[in-house]
């Protein structure tokens, strides 16, 4: 199941030349994911994935107890998150 994209997830689309499709592809092709905090509902996770052109993206996704998923942040991965892939 793919998450819904919140408007805030599109903040860096122009600068990083992202599209809804590239972000959802990267989400589906995650290389790493981890929780960002200890919250119960919604749970906030960092997801690092690769899009169709090989770019590594960082995304933040909210997972709700009801089963919903909302992607609230997407951009080209910063160095701090790339280093986690080593």
Language-model-detected regions and their locations in the chain:
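Ribonuclease/tRNase effector modules and their secretory precursors
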Residues: 1-86
